[in-house]
């Protein structure tokens, strides 16, 4: 009734009308076609759509026609897109994050302690802990309630190049320049188990088995400049299997949610492996130079596991519940972002291009994304998987449609290479760190700069946004770790 009433109320005015049909992102139709005035606003569409969905609590929704969001009215969007309106017009509806992350605006702590550059920073899955890896060979944990140093972890004998949290937040893996991997307990700062050795050159990336696949968080995969990928049993402290096939250094690695491992290399290829036995499924080819970076559409759900950012409290907690409960929560969060189709993968290269793939299904790319004028440093899917952001040496960040790879916008403001980017948990904001020594926070929907954050004395190598939305952490050449809040 409410749907009919909202449509009828608009019908009393003498306005051009259109026949429209709602459908979700997967193409599932909602209700039957109905006619609306051409000047209908998103608020009115929201009333009609929520009535058709029969939700107890109305959902915040966004509406799209041919990939363009309806911002002021349907008519305005149609004019800008020059859309044919003779037949039924499909309007795609998408639920939006119910919670909001506010932009960080100021540096609340400048934490000294590292004696060389900070190479990586990473918040734990709930945002309770912050870890950093440095050229001074140490890993450090920082106390976020007091924003002070907590533990200094010594054990590596060379630069710590890569760090990665287990999705239950109970272990941190770190990899260094001499090929060694160590595991740490964030609550004590002590090393867990023995060093994992076997790689002959430095560690380029670490990726844990997803929580919904194994709530014990027992297995971690590593990639190395030696061209191999290894899967480790962290409980037994041994290498479970070695995946070989790349002809050059493996630059990045992802452990996907559907039982696949993805590795990208300087040999210009991405290889897709079956995680449980190491069988090579397919090789993705297309890049004309080194593949530097890749991301999965499900990365954020995999990283945060059973943690739901919408339920975050002011003081981050550990995850509670039995292993089975955590596994089920992680699986439902993964399935929600994965949607109907398999997870998508985006890769970025020294050849200035990105490719979008559906690696579980096909070795042909879904899209080739061009526009950057220099090599691509990092690429990241938004937590809701709808937008891809890429950071480049051309000083820009570009936004792309997460389903089609279509170009959306360029974010300009940095005056030197953009090294790293991180999304807020609600997918509305993006923070970037640059060689120009600044961080910048961007409003993704408005496609403009929200806040400029100077403060570092030199290049910013690493940046992360806590999954609870409270803080941004950054580190770089000035050896200083900075925490930013709203």
Swiss-Prot record:
InterPro entries: G-protein_beta_WD-40_rep, Gprotein_B, NLE, WD40/YVTN_repeat-like_dom_sf, WD40_repeat_CS, WD40_repeat_dom_sf, WD40_rpt
Residue segments, region Ubiquitin-like (UBL) domain: 15-97
Post-translational modification Phosphoserine, affected residues: 80
Entry GO terms, CC: nucleolus; nucleoplasm
GO process terms (BP): hematopoietic stem cell homeostasis; inner cell mass cell differentiation; kidney development; mitotic cell cycle; negative regulation of mitotic cell cycle; Notch signaling pathway; positive regulation of canonical Wnt signaling pathway; regulation of Notch signaling pathway
Keyword terms of this UniProt record: Notch signaling pathway, Nucleus, Phosphoprotein, Repeat, WD repeat
SUPFAM superfamilies on file: WD40 repeat-like (SSF50978)
UniProt WD repeat ranges: 113-152, 155-194, 198-242, 245-283, 326-367, 371-410, 413-452, 455-486
Domain of life: Eukaryota
Compartments (UniProt record): Nucleus, Nucleolus
Pfam families assigned to the protein according to its UniProt record, in alphabetical order: NLE, WD40
Function field: Plays a role in regulating Notch activity. Plays a role in regulating the expression of CDKN1A and several members of the Wnt pathway, probably via its effects on Notch activity. Required during embryogenesis for inner mass cell survival.
UniProt-listed PANTHER family: NOTCHLESS PROTEIN HOMOLOG 1 (PTHR19848:SF0), WD40 REPEAT PROTEIN (PTHR19848)
Assembly and binders: Associates with the pre-60S ribosomal particle. Interacts (via WD repeats) with uL18. Interacts (via UBL domain) with MDN1 (via VWFA/MIDAS domain).
Sequence similarity: Belongs to the NLE1/RSA4 family.
Protein name as catalogued: Notchless protein homolog 1
Organism the protein comes from: Bos taurus
